[in-house]
Amino acid sequence: MEMIRGRGIPNGVVQVPNLSANNLLQKFFIASNHFCQRDSEHGENQQEAKKREDEAEEDEKDVELTLGLSLNGQFGTDPRSRKRRHFELGRSSSIPEGFVFDEQRSGGGNGGDMRRIVGRGGSDMFQLDRTRSLPVVTEMDIEKERKVSEKTRAFMESPVTNRGAYLTKDKNRGQAVETEKPRAFLEFKIPPTKEGKKEKDRLVVTGPVNGKGKNGNTAKKQKNNVENSGMEKARNILEDMPCVSTRDVGADGKRVEGFLYWYGGNKEEVKIVCVCHGSFLSPAEFVRHGGGTVSDDDGGDVMINPLRHIVVKLPSSSI
């Protein structure tokens, strides 16, 4: 057996049976056929391997779109993929750590050499931290709250110039504020309207205060007119309803008094109100109420007109 070296063969050697020098052509054909057979087998193996890779890539295209999450998982990729480590998006921590490099985690010095730190931990610089569940207060919000608090503090500590008082920071400051509030409320004046001004002008009496001058006696005359009108009303009432009393004295030695509530031309139309009881009585009932006797036409003492036993007090005498 002879050993012939060739390219594209795993061992690079082909065993050929011993042949004479005349059979060199046969030896060449045997080696060529063997090489072609090996090349065809190797090509088939490469095609099968390529086909398997294509199928694996097609499987990787079926992305898992579920919302399920897991620790140290990935989002939107197939966990069974062989290329997962090249496309995965690792879950970051909920608490942002900032740019903490390897040297800082190990506690080496005060940060060590910055170039060495950046060189070893450069990948950490571009990692995205996971957003927090709670809303993050921005610097603008913090600055706005600080300005509002400063304005409020300055307003509370500023002097009150309009009221003529200065509020200090001592313990009596609260009492001063409480006393200034009602004073400001009392000093507030409502501007008069046109109707109120007209009413005020109508009620104001023109003329000097001491009563001298052209219209000096106006107030005094108005007062006298009010008094006179009151007396006139009382006189009219007494004239309409004059006071009456019984002529005879009763058993208790007193006369019964009342006043005429209404009267007309006939005696049946006269009504007298008793002062002691407030009852409406006829003239005969009023005389009987005072202790007198009123008889019918058939019996003993006849009082044809009971008004003779009633005394009417005129307004001039009552006043």
From Swiss-Prot:
Residues 39-63, 99-120, 205-228 are annotated as: Disordered. It is found in: Nucleus. GO terms for cellular component: nucleus. The lineage of its organism: Eukaryota, Viridiplantae, Streptophyta, Embryophyta, Tracheophyta. Its main location: nucleus. Belongs to the Ninja family. Keywords: Nucleus. Disruption phenotype: Exhibits insensitivity to abscisic acid (ABA) and salt. Interacts with ABI5/DPBF1, AREB3/DPBF3, EEL/DPBF4, ABF1 and ABF3/DPBF5. It comes from Arabidopsis thaliana. InterPro entries: Ninja_fam, Ninja_motif, TDBD. Residues 39-54 have a biased composition (Basic and acidic residues). Predominantly expressed in roots and seedlings. This is Ninja-family protein AFP4. The keyword Cell cycle does not apply. It holds the Pfam family EAR. GO terms for biological process: negative regulation of abscisic acid-activated signaling pathway; regulation of starch biosynthetic process; response to abscisic acid; response to salt stress; signal transduction. Induction: Up-regulated by abscisic acid (ABA) and salt. Down-regulated by cold and glucose. Acts as a negative regulator of abscisic acid (ABA) and salinity responses.
